[in-house]
Amino acid sequence: MLKILHKDYKDKVKRLLSVMLPIIGTQIAIMGMNFFDASMSGQAGDADLAGAAIGGNIWMPVQTCFAGILLAAMPLIANLLGAGKKEKISTVVRHGMLLAVAFSVLIIVGGVIFLPPFLQGMSLAPEVYHIALWYMAGLGIGVLPFFLITPLRSLVDTLGYTKLSMKIYLLALPVNACLNYVLIFGKLGLPRLGGVGAGVATGITFWLLLVMFAVVVSKLQPFKQYDVLGFVHPVKHLVAEYLRIGVPMGVAIFMETSIFGVVALFIAKFGTEVIAAHQAALNFSSLIYMFPMSFSLALTIVVGVEYGAKNYQGARDYTALGLEMSLFIAMIYMMLELVAREYIALIYTTNPHVIELVKVFIIYAIMWQGGDAVAAPIQGILRGYKDVNATFWCSMLAYWAICLPVGLLLDYKFNNGAFAYWQSLDIGVICSAVVLSLRLILLQRRIKKYEE
């Protein structure tokens, strides 16, 4: 750590923190919305929590997959900034918004057709089925604004104004909490919607966020100069470039997040209390995931700019720095979680049996968080290098070729019950961290040879 005295090192720490800390604030707000959905639904009843959980677990892989594709705007803009080609940024954002509209139509139509029979096939209790279905319907009103926000936020963040994005999301958070309270518990003369109200509240909040981002990029400098809200005629090679980078990113994220949804489907057979405990522990773990995710997004920006400027040593320096900081912070929150497991469980439920289950699930969550502290930042680094195919194949291997089969084996062969799938998630995340680390080492060696 003696090199911290070096001015260049200090400057890099300062720059990375200036990008990352507001992203953490934004992630806190985003995860806070999920937290309010889960915790308030849980206070309305176990069936409300279970129904909202099932709906959320279905929505999560869908939204992260398509939003992941749209996040291609971030490395594209970062590379253009580094290369001094700012005039091309507007086209990237406009094409992202065009794709956002197309994705929204696809998801809404697909949901109307396939969601009811899919939920029926899960053998849910009637009340849980009803809540899950209408939670998704309520959330559906916010699908379009959710995806339109992604390229706009990518512009704001990549230009270095991550603090502005943070302020927008933090402003929306209390609105979401109030809407949850009013709609879930039936206040201000409105009917009591229970877990369904959480979906409606989140959908409305997405519209509020879109309005705020649209005002920012159209009225404030330096965003106004890019004129990103106008219509664009799709250019074939630009759409192809966007999808070339975005699809592997989105599918890789889908592979990672959908495994949690699939696990929830297998856990559903163990009953409402187990579903509620699983969702409570998973929801809190998602809150913690904001730290490695924030490192991932920040490293995509700083590494992408350095790589676009052909400053390869700078990109390597940010890589090492980001991983060191991520692991250090992970050690702190993992120890705190271990000590505070019971208090965490009490946030979500007062059911003694559910509390005991949550405490065990959190132990398994702590194990995979160590792997996430390595895997998530490396994914962001690789995206900064525009090396997106590696994250796809690593996710496919770790989660679907290893994690899911191991979970099924531990459940059906060794009778480990619901814990089997959490044990397999630990194995999957650790495998992902190892494989991604190897890929990063090989990539940087190849770039170094190119320099020579």
Model-predicted regions and their roles:
Residues 18-37, 138, 172, 205-209, ...:
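Transmembrane helical elements of multi-pass membrane transporters/channels
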Residues 111, 154, 180, 184, ...:
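Structural signal for membrane-spanning alpha-helices in multi-pass inner-membrane proteins
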Residues 49-112, 146-165, 264, 277-341, ...:
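Small-residue-rich hydrophobic transmembrane alpha-helices
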Residues 1-20, 77-142, 190-247, 303-368, ...:
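Short alpha-helical transmembrane segments in multi-pass integral membrane proteins
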Residues 28, 32-50, 119-126, 182-193, ...:
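Helix-terminus/linker motif at the lipid-water interface of multi-pass membrane proteins
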Residues 7-39, 43-44, 57-72, 76, ...:
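N-terminal transmembrane alpha-helices
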Residues 41-60, 92, 126-131, 195-196, ...:
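Interfacial/gating helices of multi-pass transporter permease domains
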Residues 70, 139-157, 165-176, 198-214, ...:
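Short runs within selected transmembrane alpha-helices of multi-pass transporters and secretion channels
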